[in-house]
Amino acid sequence: MSQTEEKKGIGRRVQAFGSFLSSMIMPNIGAFIAWGFIAAIFIDNGWLPNKDLATLAGPMITYLIPLLIAFSGGRLIYDLRGGIIAATATMGVIVALPDTPMLLGAMIMGPLVGWLMKKTDQLIQPRTPQGFEMLFNNFSAGILGFIMTIAGFKILAPLMKFIMHILSVAVEALVHAHLLPLVSILVEPAKIVFLNNAINHGVFTPLGADQAAKAGQSILYTIESNPGPGLGILLAYMIFGKGTAKTTSYGAGIIHFLGGIHEIYFPYVLMRPLLFIAVILGGMTGVATYQATGFGFKSPASPGSFIVYCLNAPRGEFLHMLLGVFLAALVSFVVAALIMKFTREPKQDLEAATAQMENTKGKKSSVASKLVSSDKNVNTEENASGNVSETSSSDDDPEALLDNYNTEDVDAHNYNNINHVIFACDAGMGSSAMGASMLRNKFKKAGINDITVTNTAINQLPKDAQLVITQKKLTDRAIKQTPNAIHISVDNFLNSPRYEELLNNLKKDDQA
């Protein structure tokens, strides 16, 4: 394996880890928001103080949210059974440290117990006497839950207390030294290579929850989610950009600023690498502004939309919120404008920049691909048949795997029995939902009413999936998850010629 391939492999593993963390946190964002509303509205200094209703906030962040995260983590590993025992075992960590929201402990305990439950069943079920299945299943789960609850209380809880103390001290040191804005030097570039999931959901969310529980709000929720820096970049392209980049920047600005899907501005930065300076300085400005004004959110601002920022802003601090977003956008815009005005026009176009971002991330961007409408198709496979060694090596070679499944030749498949199409992306939320909505509209206009179109995360694809649509760099993961499905790769998730080809094939099969 070459050094370049090894680096790509490491990068993909890191991104997959970030995706897994995101899959535990993102489905529970609604619970975070509900808790945030209760805390913001009913506490003593809230919008509508109510002592009785305010008592809901404590148990929700102490018990409900960690248990939901643990359940999600266990379920990702071993379905419902893994989730239930994971949530049970996490009570040990929660009860041992009742004054600290155990989000980080839940993120560890959930997948761990789910994996142990899976291995326990694999060991016990083949050896279970006939007629004793229910007894063995229930008691094996109960005994594992009992053991891991005690282990959580006695072993993991002290470890979590130490880790949370170290992280909290580090954050407090940065805050007191007025150095927290420097975190943007790492966070803003990390967003471009899709490490923001690991940073935001793995570090900022649990630490922010701890701070919010103690102080009522946390600045950590604003570090990665501020839409200002990205807006500044897109505004600069609206005014100083040329060609495709300029014309697409308007729609991208709406999707980014109001929709909260930040990845749509990443290709614009990659077109001119000097623009990394603009997003870093914009991010630092936003953090510095919020630090100076003492601003913070009570719950995660997810997605990082201006609308979410407005809804989450604490009472009496709406102007502080606006100031942080405005100044971040202003600094990012000014720096980007200077760079675009006084540096050479890049040879790289928007499509190439999108491809570079996707290659750097090790996956296709499901929303950024709206920016380009390329009709590129790979060359027809010259050698359709391969030997056994080539097939076995395809697991390590994504391109070979895609060739084996004819993922870019829509006409190569039989669609007679298709009644469900799934859009799959990394997190399974915003971008895949947009793609699914677009295809549903196409089906409706074409009179195809008997095919369901849904969206999900790659690692939650059902084993009986029939037709899966993914971005090209994600397709190899989707194939490994659902090897019996038809897989279609697209270069442009929201604007691909393959959708028309799919519609034509579905109509033909329907008429036949």
UniProtKB/Swiss-Prot annotation:
EC number: 2.7.1.197
PTS EIIB type-2 domain location: 419-512
The UniProt record lists the keyword Repeat: no
Name of the top EC class for this enzyme: transferase
UniProt-listed Pfam families: PTS_EIIC, PTS_IIB
Function: The phosphoenolpyruvate-dependent sugar phosphotransferase system (sugar PTS), a major carbohydrate active transport system, catalyzes the phosphorylation of incoming sugar substrates concomitantly with their translocation across the cell membrane. The enzyme II CmtAB PTS system is involved in D-mannitol transport.
Name of the protein: PTS system mannitol-specific EIICB component
Location within or outside the cell: Cell membrane
Gene3D superfamilies with a match to the protein in the record: 3.40.50.2300
Membrane topology annotation: Multi-pass membrane protein
Side Cytoplasmic, residues: 1-28, 76-139, 192-278, 341-512
CDD domains xref list: PTS_IIB_mannitol
Active site: 425 (phosphocysteine intermediate)
Organism: Staphylococcus aureus (strain COL)
Catalytic activity: D-mannitol(out) + N(pros)-phospho-L-histidyl-[protein] = D-mannitol 1-phosphate(in) + L-histidyl-[protein]
Region (Disordered): 355-402
Subunit structure: Homodimer.
Keywords assigned: Cell membrane, Kinase, Membrane, Phosphoprotein, Phosphotransferase system, Sugar transport, Transferase, Transmembrane, Transmembrane helix, Transport
Cellular-component GO terms for this entry: plasma membrane
